[in-house]
Regions:
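A short Gly-Trp-Pro
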Residues: 1-10, 15-160
């Protein structure tokens, strides 16, 4: 992603649009039971961004949810069509997690990891080169170094 270039995305009806003003940190596919239920699918693909780089335009509503670990998250949806746009997880301070397929160019963000594969549907086959984790991964050892450093610096600069 070039400097001064933004990524864009939207809901299905177009009432909510968003921009991401910096390169995303990491993209992952989650196979946990909660993600399966909320999406009605076998997994969801999420892209993590610094929370100050996500600019939302349009009316959204949110609801608080509990994750499988019991931690809280806040899910944000279009008020008109209900498209699930992004999540803020209590355990992911300083990051917002965008539903990757709402990005206009989502094909450019394949999963860099598959998490909670212990809950993966048995008929779903992942390629041998997929970076898979039965539960969550260690961010420092999984994310690209540049993304990890940028995230840590952001937390430090913003005293989080």
């Amino acid at each position: 992603m070039e400097k001064n270039e933004s990524l864009t995305g939207r809901c299905i009806c177009g009432q909510v649009k968003y921009r991401i003003t910096e390169k995303p940190l990491f993209t992952q596919a989650c196979h946990c039971k909660d993600c399966k239920i909320i999406t009605g699918s076998s997994y969801v693909i999420n892209t993590s961004v610094l929370d100050n780089t996500l600019i939302i335009e349009g009316d959204i509503s949110s609801t608080e949810l509990k994750t499988g670990s019991g931690a809280t998250s806040r899910a944000y949806f279009c008020n008109k069509c209900g498209t699930y746009i992004y999540t803020d997880y209590a355990t992911a301070v300083g990051r917002s997690t965008v539903r990757t397929k709402t990005l206009d160019n989502s094909e450019n963000f394949p999963p860099e990891a598959h998490i909670f594969t212990k809950d993966k549907d048995p008929w779903l086959k992942l390629t041998d080169d997929a970076n898979c984790f039965e539960k969550m991964y260690d961010m420092k050892n999984t994310w690209p170094k540049e993304s990890y450093e940028r995230y840590k610096n952001y937390l430090k600069e913003n005293k989080r």
